[in-house]
């Protein structure tokens, strides 16, 4: 299950294995508290990338979507490496 969540959220760890284990545990706890299935997270990730991609040229390989949770709230945190901002004519309508 951890491998699936890591792939869906494009999680990349660094540092000591203990730190990586803590990050994975936090991710699993946040996932459980948010009650989101891996399929739903994957769909959300794809849709978010599509919307952001309308306005920004982003590095999708380095994009991270993380769930973080504390005792009161769960947050979806997105990190998008921006290559450039796409310029659109003001009259162009969004899809």
Curated annotation (Swiss-Prot):
Q: Which domain of life is it from?
A: Bacteria
Q: Which cysteines are joined by disulfide bonds?
A: none
| Alphabetical keyword list | Cell cycle, Cell division
GO biological process terms, semicolon-separated = cell division; regulation of division septum assembly
Establish whether keyword DNA repair is in the entry. no
Gene3D superfamilies xrefs: Cell division topological specificity factor MinE
Protein family according to the UniProt entry: Belongs to the MinE family.
Its job: Prevents the cell division inhibition by proteins MinC and MinD at internal division sites while permitting inhibition at polar sites. This ensures cell division at the proper site by restricting the formation of a division septum at the midpoint of the long axis of the cell.
- UniProt protein name: Cell division topological specificity factor
Q: What is the source species?
A: Microcystis aeruginosa (strain NIES-843 / IAM M-2473)
